[in-house]
Amino acid sequence: MNDAQALARIEELNKVLHYHNNLYYQKDTTEISDFEFDTLLQELIELEKQFPLYLKADSPSQRVGGTVTKEFASISHKYPMLSLSNTYSEEEIREFDERVQKAVGHAVEYVCEMKFDGVAISITYKNGMIAQAVTRGDGVRGDDVTNNIKTIKSIPLKIQSATFPEEFEVRGEVYLPYEMFERINQEREDIGEAALANPRNAASGTVKMQDSGIVAKRALDCFIYSLLQDSNKQPTHAAALAQLKEWGFRVSDSYKVCKNVDEIIQYINHWSEERFKLPLATDGIVIKVNDLRLQSELGMTAKSPRWAIAYKFKAEEASTPILSVEYQVGRTGAVTPVANLAPVHLAGTTVKRATLHNANEMERLNLHIGDTVFVEKGGEIIPKITRVDVSKRIAGSQMIPFIQNCPVCDTKLIRIEGEAAWYCPNDKGCAPQITGKIEHFIQRKAMNIDGIGSETIELLYQKKLIRNVADLYTLTYDQLIQLDRFGEKSVTNVLNGIEASKQTPFKSVLFAIGIRYVGSTVAEKLALHFKSINALEKASIEELLQAPEIGIKIAQSIIEWFSVDTNVQLIEDLKKAGVKLELSEHEILKPESDKFAGKSFVISGVFENYERDELKDLILKNGGKISSGITGKLNYLVAGENMGPAKLEKAQKLNITILSEAEFISLLNS
């Protein structure tokens, strides 16, 4: 095939594949089989390899991925991506309608749309071609994830229409369908990795992956819900949605134009039940003023638009019988009861297990063998039991007692004064405690050792190759290559990951060794205060209490940990292995600014765009301090969703400034 023939065939394949993509994703119909489509796509990929000059930016082959992004560029949004005000009640929706009518002076038409639970994305098109895709970020700036978004087959790489603006922006929700979410978790379980918490977290993590080839395999999808351009060509939001569909974007058919607030309530009542039939996670309904001119007139507050509000669904609940209760032992020795349930469909997934937390919770529920219980699922992996349907209790059934001995090593359990949990004290001989400590050691927030999962740790423990975390640094190629499922590449990855972990900062090592009550934040404070493991080991209880945020419970735990000979030997073994057990000069924290100097913060709840650790880093980098509790000396409480009401109430009583996520970012950027 010569150049002219190759170019002609590549252009033909581009046209044909775009046509069939549009049929499948926008019109829900097909003219060829998946096999025929894949054959054409593979032909295109091979031709583009042979004739790379003819590879087009909008080629369907670009959805396959393969681009590796080392670092995501931070991009300013042309139009800020503000959060919506939330409501959970019909009364507040009626109040919203009253505010809108009062502001504009007449009755208003609304559009109601499903609020899909995924990751908000902004996509810019120039001359009909996808130009850039940016995450929501803090609403002002986000990350450039264009290569990853191009792998989503329902997002057009090129507008399949004769007319479109020279430049425009669309916004949508990237999500992971339940089916794919469960498949990914099954694959992770098969290789001994922890399950992903929920589809939203999975989608968020996938969008930020460095390798777009892996992103492509996860089959993300996207519903587009907004069109932005410098001059609106459509009079209403509903007309804009229709225009988006015409251009080839995937728009949910679930939206409805509502003439009044009563129709909004009917829509909510309908989807409160029907949403469970959808193949993806939803967490509410978005209500928008339909008239785009009125949207402009109503404008924005500092945090959210005045012309829209989000109604949030309550957590779903289902009832099912308890089949049995099993007990799990964690790395600290804490014993957690878990109920095995008759399978029940809940929040889009099949639930078979629910946590019972501890003995106090079992006593509160007054659980009996065979009880039917109500199960609620928020964002957790394992749902929780909220109450018992006593009316269905089997006559003569026995109360389920909490066990007295460890379910693994049969050691008698103990209870620490002031704690709800029961513990197995056999921390040097109880297998799940030993492997749990090693799993904790290798995790991303600790030593971040690639190539090792929980299944590998179990195997190494069974083969008596490891008995503590220091043993990881004695593993050899010859030992690993003999193990099942270990090839040359996987052995090399494991050994490289272990070697690289020797450069892990001291604060992370201190967290990784697993002293009780020393989480990542406390470990960082201890590392900055004492500078080395030697100084920490020698510290008296009085000296420990002088460190920031260190109370008597943590201080006593540290003293107790270093009083155990095997722990002292562990530190010596880690030193010999070359692990960093002191701060280097450049690790001594020097704030990048003094914006928050002298200010203390508590962070609580779940946030839309940041992990709590990321918010803590921002505070520390700007000279602020992280506090562990609400006191009169606290300056700010950064409050996310699902934070404890007692903490919020205490902060309000003490007149502490309470910041939302957006308000915190605004304060940071001011």
UniProtKB/Swiss-Prot annotation:
CDD domains, per database record: BRCT_DNA_ligase_like, LIGANc
Function: DNA ligase that catalyzes the formation of phosphodiester linkages between 5'-phosphoryl and 3'-hydroxyl groups in double-stranded DNA using NAD as a coenzyme and as the energy source for the reaction. It is essential for DNA replication and repair of damaged DNA.
GO biological process, one term: DNA replication
UniProt-recorded name of the protein: DNA ligase
Cofactor: Mg(2+); Mn(2+)
Any matching Pfam family: Nlig-Ia
Organism of derivation: Cytophaga hutchinsonii (strain ATCC 33406 / DSM 1761 / CIP 103989 / NBRC 15051 / NCIMB 9469 / D465)
GO molecular function: DNA binding; DNA ligase (NAD+) activity; metal ion binding
